[in-house]
Amino acid sequence: MIVVVKNHPYSYDVENLAEIFFPYEKIKVLSQLPFDTEDNILAVTEMSADEIRVEARVFEKVIIKSEKIGKESDCQNIMSVLFYRAFSELLGVSYPWGILYGVRPARFWHSLSDKYSKERARNIFEQKYLVSPKKLDLVARVAENENKIISLSQKNSFSLYVSVPFCPTRCSYCSFVSHSIEKAAALVEPYVDLLVREIAETAKYANDLGLRLESVYYGGGTPTALSANQLSRVAKAISDNFSLSTLREYTVEAGRPDTVTSEKLAALKSAGVGRISINPQSFNDDVLAAIGRRHTVRQTLDAFALAREAGFDNINMDFIAGLPKDDIKSFKHSIETALSLGAESVTVHTLCLKTGAYMVTRDNVFDHGDIDTVNKMVDFSREYLSGAGYVPYYMYRQGKSLGNLENVGWSKPGSECLYNVFMMDETHTVLAVGAGAVTRLKNPVSGKIERIYNYKYPYEYISGFDTVSYTHLRAHETPEHL
């Protein structure tokens, strides 16, 4: 796709909107249309002293939208609305989030409602950004529930993120930096050795600054790809070096059911872990096979039962709308099964095909559900979970998600994941350890966030650890940085 930008500074906006309509097209932003182009999808966006004009073209079909402007016109918004309406009409599609892009819609809602009022925020979302009433209601509910969690954080609060970038196998939709245990077995033990060291070193800075630990979260990857002994070592490093007296939540992703054992669960429980996530993604074996999960529905049910036997009373289950081989009946069955098990929280993601995912790279084939079906899946999950008493407490969006839809965390009241909210809202500092981890240092006065990136891959983390690892905090030892 070619997007031509003439005489205006809104190339970022129109490029983002182009990705909503054409998420898998390579988008080229140019200042003029080439004479010899072979692209069949074109957008020409231009602004003069008194008019904004957008021409949308797909093969032989063309639609032109324009609007007169003056000194007081919001030209950025007008350009975006014209672009959206032109392609929406041309393709016969509309998106419930309208022209709103960005990861954190609830945070945007917070800023508008704090600056104006909730009623004004609704009007802006609906009139300016073309957000549907359903999504308006959702974002307002999420923001309300988020506020209850955000208010728990204090000026010197922080959370700890522990990265375990290993999985049994790589799922076909995944683009995260994670390594198959089968291919990276030799890296796991030295990785854990260094992770324990980094935890201890990181704790020194947190303790010296008098920071208050609110939540601990192990992510990845699949943390339970580690052995019971390795999990115990990581947990012991945390309890030996950090004060857990203020800890509100301790979560471990036990994402792949085929990694869950009674020994690992016992190790986590004895370490004080109170919340785990067992992620089926689907309760349909054909879907699981299609996405390379290499576990069965039976294994998920068994893992959940083991977790209950081990005493876990706060279990999350993740699902993805839009997976290959899935349909609305199968998706409904998955959500209904999670609730029949009594899962305390359910997170519903929309399939997002990133560049590094196997589903994208294999022959450039995109095997996924159609947009209308995915919309129905997401709508069903909202209605069913809400009707069962679950509340939406956490939401984020990603580029290249099917239908430009959202990911939402639902929970029984009181079972929300605090870390998810703290992290997504950027409520306070997050100290992150391990390969691929990103520390977020928040200035409590200005609110400014500084990101510090650890080594991306386990082999880099291991080979370079003694050179620069964990010293990244030394430049930030004064409280004003945190």
Over which residues does each language-model region extend?
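Short Lys/Arg-enriched alpha/beta "domain-start" segment
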Residues: M1-F35
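A C-terminal junction/extension of Radical SAM enzymes
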Residues: I27-S31, D36-D39, G356-V433
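Conserved small/polar residues in nucleotide/adenosyl-binding loops
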Residues: T471-E480
